[in-house]
Amino acid sequence: HPALRGTVVDREDAAPGAQALLATRGLGRRVRFAVGDFFTWVPGGADWYLLKSILHNWDDAAAARILARCAAAAPEGGGLLVIERLRPERLRAGSRDDAVARADLNMLMGLGGRERSLLEYERLLSAAGFRLVSCEPLGHEFAAIKATRMNDADQVRSRETA
């Protein structure tokens, strides 16, 4: 997709490595690097926002703040793609769910975050002003969760029914 353009937002200390990698991959003209903190700023004007293995690092309150920043930056109908490991609603012992349970415990102990179920992501997304559109499995318990920013009237209705 040579017409696509993007912005990577990360800490200042990540800039040299990210810019070098983008240049070696031939993406220097298509992808720019912006120093930022997603708790305080997300660049506006994008058609899509991508969060890959971000939200599971944080508790629900912090994840909600990140999603709220994305919603504030996105236009009505703008897209959000969240790529995360999904925890089943109910874990089954002795199954592949054991790996998700271990990852969940690791996130809690290491960063204070957690793995979440699709229903938990849907609630976080809705509270931030996004509507869940789809969820596609990617393998190894990961999924691509696609959402769009609701218009103001839909956000009011969503809060009223919550």
Locations of regions flagged by a protein language model:
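Alpha-helical subdomain
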Residues: H1-A162
